[in-house]
């Protein structure tokens, strides 16, 4: 399967502390259990599912942060879904098709492109970074920095990780006269395994991490 780095939602205003508390309870398996005495007193603690339901209900989705247009709200999303409809061989009624896709975020039209990677995985949202590509970069940035990608992080840790990757990438780019890769969105026209190819992966991930981290989002390491 390999590593996919999935950006997490960020807490709604006023939910910041509770967001972190629930995250730590769930990820560290510290969900409180009712004792026998608690049960006698009628005291109940929320279950894991109840905590997750509360956690997700109080998030701002990453699609909003990358400013992805939404079907049923934005004109460009309507034009996009209409084109998809016109491409169908078997067409249901247009009204039915639009209703089925109401609320869909069109990530490929997102205005904040640093949050939409070019290194993606099949079957995942377009803003999920295929972290497995970083495995090819051990020889240029070191095993510790690569392995850190496999750790789920909240926003501050995500931003810090991105900044450290960026600093290493900048150093390598300066030494090899490859600074142009920092602002190049698409992969370089070079063979896989070259320093150019590897450095572009590192730059792309660093920018992705910095974008989400500075905007209050962490990421889930899914592997």
Residue ranges of each PLM-predicted region?
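Acidic (Asp/Glu-rich) sequence patches and key acidic residues
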Residues: 1-211, 215, 222-223
